[in-house]
């Protein structure tokens, strides 16, 4: 007779609880949480997931720390105006997690600060696809990136960037103000006025 072999595939997830909310996020091939988070119930957690504390301590945690150090290193060099060392640090972070929002913003800002619009365009295209880029925790980076797109005369990209943000949050008057500023530079006065009025309706 023939023997059937059963193969079991293990998927690793990073699970975090804040208050009553439990969220899980898949681990990428480098063992860091990456990609969209999903909210699950306590019942789901207990029935579908098994804890792996040793794997977390030996594989996941060290990689998460390495990623965090690389991003912080990049931020620190970028703030000092040392854009080439910053780029190297962000690059390293992106080899660990290419979807890391802070590293993508960081390297994008580094390119924009150097006036390297071709490379900034690549990062812009990646960022508009990452929903995480538009979350409140990254608001200051989001704003800085949008302003730098405008200052580098990447007006079309700047507008597309703010429109993408508006798909996820319609009630932020600052987005309409920022769009109006870009449209003023682009000499699109009617759209500029429309967006200013919209901003005023949201925050009279």
Kindly give the residue locations of the regions a language model identified.
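Alpha-helical adaptor scaffolds
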Residues: 102-185
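Extended, charge-rich intrinsically disordered regulatory tails
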Residues: 177, 184, 188, 196-199, ...
């Amino acid at each position: 007779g023939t023997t059937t072999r059963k193969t079991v595939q293990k998927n690793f997830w990073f699970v975090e609880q804040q208050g009553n909310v439990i969220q899980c996020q898949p681990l990428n091939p480098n063992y860091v949480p990456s990609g969209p988070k999903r909210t699950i119930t306590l019942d789901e957690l207990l029935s579908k997931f098994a804890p792996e504390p040793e794997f977390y301590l030996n594989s996941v945690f060290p990689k998460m720390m390495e990623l965090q150090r690389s991003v912080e290193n990049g931020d620190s060099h970028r703030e000092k105006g040392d854009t080439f060392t910053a780029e190297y640090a962000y690059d390293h972070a992106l080899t660990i997690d290419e979807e890391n929002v802070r590293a993508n913003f960081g390297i994008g800002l580094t390119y924009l600060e150097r006036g390297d619009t071709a490379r900034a365009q690549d990062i812009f295209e990646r960022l508009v696809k990452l929903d995480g880029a538009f979350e409140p925790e990254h608001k200051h980076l989001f704003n800085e990136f949008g302003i730098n797109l405008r200052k580098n005369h990447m007006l079309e990209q700047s507008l597309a960037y703010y429109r993408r943000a508006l798909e996820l949050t319609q009630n932020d008057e600052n987005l309409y103000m920022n769009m109006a500023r870009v449209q003023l530079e682009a000499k699109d006065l009617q759209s500029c006025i429309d967006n200013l009025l919209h901003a005023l309706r949201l925050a009279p």
